[in-house]
UniProtKB/Swiss-Prot annotation:
GO terms for biological process: sporulation resulting in formation of a cellular spore; symbiont-mediated killing of host cell. Disulfide bonds: none annotated. One of its GO terms (cellular component) is extracellular region. Belongs to the delta endotoxin family. Transmembrane segments: none annotated. It is found in: Secreted. The gene is cry16Aa. This is Pesticidal crystal-like protein Cry16Aa. It comes from the Bacteria. CDD domains: delta_endotoxin_C. Its main location: secreted. One of its GO terms (molecular function) is toxin activity.
Length: 613
């Protein structure tokens, strides 16, 4: 019996690694940014420019993006086209650098005489973005070069954000042809919507084309989704926080709750529809949870190999002791068991040692996990001593991945075809791994110093009654993860015994001094009706608002677009005490009107002090 080594983790090119530096920058600066003090404004554009155009090789990041685009779309650009893209990206980069230098000179010295230069540079770089960004849409290769287009679009939106923050001080709006800040603000909203829709449409086009090509396997689909989630979906999901009227305070961003998948281990090509592979290798939409432990079951005699495993997840209610278990393969008292606990640590990479037959991998002999605690490792089974220790490198970087530089932690270990596979040493066992972004916290924290963003998939209980239904559905790409669907259907001429109601239980943990604080509450949601009301409850206190229609359709589970979602504020503040309340309840009440009604809510809780919307 031979043993080969296989590894599973999230492959990072230098282009992908740079994008996560951009995302981390936006996360960190947005959490600490004080819009009320112009002198403490962090330089988001300045930091991003240093990431994307590194010295000494300023083409390295964008060259990596082009290579990634070619790989995942199976389309190669000509050398001349690549050279043109790099020249154009450098040209855009220089324009942004000139603006950034003028901006820094003004803000460092706060000298009114330097405003003219800032406005000139702003208008110059804004003009090239408005008129020339289509240089990054190469005909028939739009999806291939989409990672570059996205980064330029993101910089443009950040530029417009600067315009919203400083435009009055610069007398900028009339210089740009707008009557006032409000008209400029509407332009910013339109541009945000355009970039999000444009990038999402190209992402979906590329994915559809891959699925239609019979030469592509599930590996190709997984790789495309992974890379383009990093390059496109994650980026468009955070663009809405650039809205300075909605997010006018520091924000605890909790947007990127979606799972991403590394390439399957021991992939078995069964020549089945892509939709069937998705069921085998991916997790269906579900409430957010954190991996608590994995138990590995090994046969007690004969050749040792992995017969089964149990994933245990904990929800966002930190006071609840129960765990959700998912079972794979063979398990029970007839097998030896080893358990790896993740209750206070994360696994950010793992390594496989497989049994092989005819040089093909079959069953798993050992797995090595790299974990965040002291840069340590945990090993299931016994790896062959002839194999070297596995260390994941970020391609193009000299440094190794470690407990500081990782970006995603392990969420699920999945045995494909679990209900059909025969577990023996010579039967190929294929495994899939999902990962979640490290910036997502294990519960919902409420601070008096931040806008507290709460994706409603970070809940623990969904409850419905009568003709109502509440569930988790797959998000449309720009939401950062899955969504909650609150839905009712009342057949004609039938009257329920009571009103129709759906309820969401939201675990919280307060992070403010003893006593109670008043919070404003904002919902971002999509709704195909205006029948009913929403109530948010904290202990004995509650606030209500009427449901407002945001789009018009009679379809069940419609394809949601960015423009379907709107922000709505509760008219009253909600009083939350620092102790004694560990849950909020969001309730949807529907009247007796006949028809189908659907709501897709998201939640944020800003502190009221110095808050305006």
């Amino acid at each position: 019996m031979n043993t080969n080594i296989f590894s599973t983790h999230l492959e990072f090119s230098k282009g992908v690694a740079s994008v996560f530096k951009v995302i981390d920058t936006i996360h960190n600066i947005s959490k600490n940014n004080n819009f009320n003090n112009i002198l403490t404004q962090d330089f988001i554009i300045d930091t991003i420019l240093s990431i994307l155009w590194e010295d000494p090789n300023e083409n390295e990041i964008f060259s990596s993006m082009i290579e990634d685009g070619e790989t995942i779309t199976n389309k190669n650009l000509s050398a001349q086209t690549k050279e043109g893209l790099l020249l154009n990206s450098n040209s855009f980069g220089l324009k942004f650098k000139y603006y950034n230098n003028a901006f820094r000179s003004w803000i460092d010295n706060y000298n009114p005489t330097s405003i003219d230069d800032v406005v000139y540079r702003f208008k110059d770089v804004n003009s090239i973005c408005e008129n020339n960004i289509n240089e990054f849409k190469v005909k028939n290769y739009e999806v291939t070069v989409l990672p570059i287009y996205m980064q330029i679009a993101n910089l443009h939106l950040l530029l417009l954000r600067d315009g919203m923050i400083y435009g009055d001080a610069w007398n900028l709006y009339r210089e740009l042809g707008f009557s006032d800040q409000d008209s400029f603000y509407n332009h910013v909203l339109d541009k945000t919507k355009f970039y999000i829709n444009d990038c999402l449409n190209y992402y979906n086009t590329g994915l559809s084309n891959l699925k239609l090509d019979p030469n592509n396997s599930w590996i190709d689909i997984t790789r495309y989704c992974r890379f383009m989630t990093f390059y496109i979906l994650d980026m468009i999901s955070i663009c809405p926080i650039y809205d300075t009227k909605v997010y006018d305070k520091p924000i605890n961003m909790q947007t990127l709750t979606r799972k991403v998948y590394s390439d399957p281990v021991n992939f078995i090509d069964e020549n089945i529809p892509i939709s069937e592979y998705e069921k085998m290798y991916n997790i269906s939409p579900e409430l957010f949870s954190t991996l608590f432990s994995i138990s590995f079951y090994t046969n007690k005699s004969g050749n040792k190999f992995l017969n089964g495993h149990v994933n245990r997840h904990v929800g966002t209610d930190l006071n609840y002791n129960g765990l959700r278990e998912t079972h794979y393969g063979n398990y029970g008292s007839n097998y030896e068991v080893e358990s790896m606990a993740f209750d206070d640590i994360k696994a950010y990479s793992n390594n496989y040692f497989n049994n092989t037959q005819n040089n093909n991998p079959t069953s798993v002999k050992s797995i090595k996990f790299l974990i965040t605690k002291n840069n340590d490792e945990w090993i299931y089974g016994e790896p062959d001593s002839s194999n070297i220790d596995f260390t994941r490198n970020i391609q193009g970087y000299l440094s190794n991945l470690n407990n500081e530089s990782y970006t995603h932690s392990l969420s699920d270990m999945i045995l494909a075809n679990n209900d059909k596979i025969q577990i023996n040493i010579d039967t190929p066992h294929s495994y899939s791994y999902s990962w979640i972004y490290k910036g997502i916290e294990d519960t919902n924290y409420i601070s008096d110093k931040l806008i507290n963003q709460i994706p409603l998939v970070k809940e623990v209980k969904l409850k419905s009654r009568h003709y109502s239904e509440i569930s988790v559905i797959k998000g449309p790409g720009f939401t950062g993860g899955d969504l909650i669907l609150s839905k009712v259907h009342k057949p004609a001429n039938q009257i329920p015994a009571q009103y129709m109601k759906n309820k969401i239980t939201i675990p919280i943990k307060t992070k403010f001094p003893a006593g109670s604080q008043d919070f404003k509450v904002r919902l971002c949601y999509a709704s195909n009706h205006d029948i009913g009301l929403i109530r948010l409850i904290a202990g004995s206190k509650y606030i209500t608002t009427n449901i407002q229609q945001t789009f018009n359709t009679t379809e069940n589970n419609p394809s949601l677009i960015y423009d379907d979602f709107k922000y709505f504020n509760f008219n009253e503040t909600l009083s939350i005490t620092s102790s004694g309340i560990d849950e909020l309840y969001l309730e949807f009440y529907y009247s007796y009107t006949d028809g189908n009604f659907e709501d897709f809510p998201k939640l944020s809780i800003p502190y009221t002090r110095n808050y305006s919307c």
